[in-house]
Amino acid sequence: MRKLCGNGSTSMISTDSYKNTTFFVIAFSTFLISCIDYTKLFSSLSTPEAVGRLEDVLIGQCITKGSFAHTLFLIILSAFFIFQVANFAMSVPRLLDMYRFYTHLLGVPDADIQTLPWPEIVRLIGDIRKHNPVTSLSNGQATALADMVGNDAKAPVKKLDAHDIANRILRQENYLIALFNKDLLDLRVRIPVPHIFTAFIPSSMLILSADPPLPSLQSEPERKFLSFGANHLTKALEWNLRFCLLGYLFDRRGQVRKEFVREKRRKDLVQGLRRRFVFMGILNAIFAPFIILYLLIYSFFRYFEEYHKNPSSIGSRQYTPYAQWKFREFNELPHLFERRLDRSYETAKEYVDQFPKERTALVMRFVAFVAGSFAAVLLVASLIDPDLFLHFEITPHRTVLFYLGVFGSVLAISRGMVPQENMVFDPEASLNEVVRWTHYLPVEWRGQLHSQMVHQEFSKLFALKIMIFFSELLSVILTPFILFFSLPPCAAAIIDFFREFTVHVDGVGYVCSFAVFDFARHGNIDSNRPETGVQGATGPDAGDSGGGGGGGGGGFAAGKSGRQTTRRAASASPSRFKQKDWRSNENKMEQSFLHFKATHPDWQPSDPSSSLFLDRLMGAGARNRPAGGISGSIYGGGGGGGGGGGRGLGIDGSVMAEMEEERLRAKSQSYERAWAKSSHLHRPDISNPLRHPHSAASEIIEEEEGGEGDKGDDSIDGWSKRMKTDGESDDEQEEHGRLWKDDGVQIDIKQ
């Protein structure tokens, strides 16, 4: 649906058909490799009887005379092409259904789909379910609508909002975002090393196997692996991860398989996931030679024109696939994410180019001067005598035209590697501007934005395109090792993650709990509470077992959301996650929530803890801001110095102007009353670690007979102070004074 929204149905069908370039690559490469006699072609160039026609060097019946390897290559690529065509043919009916959905139900003509804002489409979809609560779900022909709004007759009829629609569209992507955020995927290369060679390899490069040895091999020395490289993701590896993980977790309808939320199937699911990793590793190893050959041919056809037209583009950069998954936020639609990253490219390039490269600059200036001098002489000579341009050979069979192209390319590349003379050197301000759009600032970067360490780390995320291309080629060889040796030990943690971080939402289905913005379970509001290692004692709502439900909770203890339910675990085994493991790293969920609210200002969260979190943030911002502006204090990560760098989200006065002060004040007062009333309640025994915080309110909240506990400081300043933990120094905390802004939406954080 998101693709149709951005392109229109006709454009989408045309785009998908043009994506099937495999046939052209197969046909043209076969012609070049098998159908031309290159010995006759090149030998004839130096003889008086030079061949002047193509038919003189063609080989008759070239396809049938091909070698076995070439024939096998053609068969494999042809099978892949047929697979692509079949997928395209199967997608056409769905695109037509979506076209009818937009045209007849939403009333949006195909010509307007490309320009209609996404919030307007969300509003139209919500109105359909509001005005057609029965017919919209009972019409068997409206498959596109059923996929969008659901067909669960038992679910209460409720108008779909932007959050529900985003959870449906990004149901699978949200799990991948969470897996990368929690660093559950080991993407380092591991190569098994025979025991006799371990003495010749540095011990720092050797690691032990993460899998326990088989009973029959326990007497043998433990296997060691040669491990190198950091977590690195390529398109080939990403495709394999989607197949192994998402193809395993979801059924054909795109819904989470029920067995993944049950503890009793854990062992079978872990073994099944390991087998998928191993099987795909073997499959990738078998087809690796053919994939490399295809990528080389395809890349040559694709990039030659680009680099020929603009040779300096060989030094251009882009974000790596791994960086994109680290930057992306929960429930962030692709077109919004791409727009956010696109706005950071120029500043990111300026930041990378700012760091001193005196030696490189001196060498490139000299190379540019020499290449420019040769090119100038040849160009002037060609202007004086035009015949020299095509007929004068500087070296055998190499005319002035050839060397003008060579020197021009060298000149363009060398100039691209020389920084501009008028560039202002301020890497800290530049990186702050980049963070404003990427929303990524690890803890170890705080206070070090000017350092070479941060520059090197960022350069790995914002890499040269040519290096990304070579990484893609190399990954074809290394992906089998990652799938076969690195990922199988992660299977147990991945299955546990799928089970523990999957919740059921009425009318939406099973989704990743981070994407629900469940502050009661995952909110990083009370950071001062010691870790218990017990599931359920996480977040602000997991009250102390003694008394007083308000202690340390930051005022965010909430009952069951009106729409959300959760699965019951079949087993009462202890949780495998500690308290800190329930929270997203780098406060990804909190900043995703604020970013989603800023992107969809009309959306009102249905979960009380989320609403209270937002209202208290805005209330604190209103108290702290000067007249005419908004500033609040919500920070989950460190920021740099000036320039608005940091982690978090801001909402400026233009967005807040849409929220009437009276309505906001009344709403805040209602939450204050709800909080005052809920402070007399506490959760019962949390010894059952698998009880979800969002179970039915009658099952999880009881009246406390004792006195009322300390509510703690639940203001936004109190929340920010509690965030200042985990060894974070005062100097680092001072960097929290500013936040990034996104799409014209800004909060200025001040403590």
Swiss-Prot record:
It is found in: Preautophagosomal structure membrane; Cytoplasmic vesicle membrane; Golgi apparatus membrane; Endoplasmic reticulum membrane. The keyword Transport applies. Phosphorylated by ATG1. ATG1 phosphorylation is required for preautophagosome elongation. Residues 528-584, 676-751 are annotated as: Disordered. Residues 1-21, 93-276, 298-365, 420-465, 487-751 are cytoplasmic. It catalyses: a 1,2-diacyl-sn-glycero-3-phosphocholine(in) = a 1,2-diacyl-sn-glycero-3-phosphocholine(out); a 1,2-diacyl-sn-glycero-3-phospho-L-serine(in) = a 1,2-diacyl-sn-glycero-3-phospho-L-serine(out); a 1,2-diacyl-sn-glycero-3-phosphoethanolamine(in) = a 1,2-diacyl-sn-glycero-3-phosphoethanolamine(out); a 1,2-diacyl-sn-glycero-3-phospho-(1D-myo-inositol-3-phosphate)(in) = a 1,2-diacyl-sn-glycero-3-phospho-(1D-myo-inositol-3-phosphate)(out). This is Autophagy-related protein 9. It comes from Cryptococcus gattii.
